[in-house]
């Protein structure tokens, strides 16, 4: 709701750059509560803010007041009354308006686009959980692979991305909050088309806030988020388990691994009951995958025999899965259990 032609032109130009549609409402068409609440963002001038403030409209997010000059005291008062989060002088603060409309458009898409989150953890050390997490990420149409084991040397080594430019966990100065997925994606390395947030070759610790923020950004971006978890139940690990649509417990097919899976399963289900088992061969004593699942008390999602020459491949450029490989087939079966991402809609500014 802008009466100044110059401010209207500024808004139209910024909105076109962001990719949102603007609906202009003038003084002859007072805003209704429905229109006020339905728009992805509301942009007002001083007069419109004063008018909407007198209507006692409900408080909402993404309300901005634009001015062409230094904001007067009366403008700030009108902005506070209407519940605006920003008072922006144009064109000097155009960048802030761009960010505000982009965030509003992304928020409007949240209900339509929602990626799935899968957390992968080993029943015991050396179970192959990290490898299976990489296989899931490679088998997904678009994935974010999140390394949550700060003492494992970096999952980027498993995808051949150790020299790829981009941020790793220690590079992120992040406490939590809401992140823009496009910005996250642009900052991360993408070896073989997978966005990877990896650890490094030096130790560090992870807090729950940044982990939750990164997972949430990927989910809102509509990608499949694959979290590789350590067997230590830290706050960061529990944040990923809480956020997961599916927790995958990976176990070798031997007696000791079977016992370890049975020990780990109730701990995991107490945090997230959506737990399934993947059993990896070989089976030196003839134990069957279904028997491991019965002992662990966990539904069997997939089983697979040992993949030949896997260790050699990992030493020379990381995991590269052929579509018909046993790892890829098992990964597709697990991905088939996840909820499908919806389709989004474009945001609208009023």
Curated annotation (Swiss-Prot):
GO terms for molecular function: ATP binding; ATP hydrolysis activity. Induction: Induced by albendazole and thiabendazole, which inhibit the GTPase activity of FtsZ and probably septum formation. Gene3D superfamilies: P-loop containing nucleotide triphosphate hydrolases. This is Uncharacterized protein Rv3660c. One of its GO terms (cellular component) is cytoplasmic side of plasma membrane. Was identified as a high-confidence drug target. May play a role in septum formation. Disruption phenotype: Essential for growth. SUPFAM superfamilies: P-loop containing nucleoside triphosphate hydrolases (SSF52540). It comes from Mycobacterium tuberculosis (strain ATCC 25618 / H37Rv). InterPro entries: P-loop_NTPase, ParA/MinD_ATPase, Ssd-like.
């Amino acid at each position: 709701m802008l009466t100044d032609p110059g401010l209207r032109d500024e808004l139209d130009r910024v909105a076109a750059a962001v990719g949102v549609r603007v609906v202009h409402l003038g003084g002859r068409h007072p805003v209704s509560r429905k229109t006020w609440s339905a728009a992805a963002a509301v942009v007002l001038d001083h007069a419109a803010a004063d008018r909407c403030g007198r209507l006692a409209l409900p408080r909402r997010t993404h309300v901005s007041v634009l001015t062409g000059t230094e904001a007067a005291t009366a403008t700030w008062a009108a902005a506070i009354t209407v519940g605006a989060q920003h008072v922006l002088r144009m064109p000097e603060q155009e960048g802030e308006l761009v960010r505000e409309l982009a965030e509003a458009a992304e928020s409007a898409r949240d209900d339509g686009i929602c990626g799935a989150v899968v957390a992968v953890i080993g029943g015991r050390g050396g179970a192959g959980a990290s490898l299976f997490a990489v296989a899931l990420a490679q088998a997904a149409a678009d994935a974010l692979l999140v390394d949550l084991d700060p003492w494992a040397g970096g999952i980027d080594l498993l995808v051949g991305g150790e020299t790829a430019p981009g941020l790793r966990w220690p590079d992120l100065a992040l406490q939590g909050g809401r992140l823009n997925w496009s910005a996250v994606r642009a900052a991360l390395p993408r070896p073989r088309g997978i966005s990877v947030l990896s650890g490094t070759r030096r130790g560090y610790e992870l807090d729950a806030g940044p982990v939750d923020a990164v997972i949430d950004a990927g989910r809102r971006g509509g990608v499949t988020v694959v979290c590789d978890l350590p067997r230590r139940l830290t706050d960061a690990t529990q944040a990923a388990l809480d956020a997961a649509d599916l927790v995958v417990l990976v176990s070798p097919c031997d007696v000791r691994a079977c016992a370890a899976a049975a020990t780990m399963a109730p701990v995991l289900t107490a945090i997230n009951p959506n737990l399934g088992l993947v059993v990896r061969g070989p089976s030196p004593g003839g134990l069957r995958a279904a028997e491991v699942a019965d002992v662990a008390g966990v539904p069997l999602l997939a089983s697979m025999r040992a993949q030949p020459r896997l260790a050699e491949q990992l030493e020379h450029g990381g995991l590269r899965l052929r579509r018909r490989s046993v790892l890829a087939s098992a990964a597709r079966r697990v991905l088939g259990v996840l909820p499908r991402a919806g389709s989004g809609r474009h945001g609208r500014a009023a």
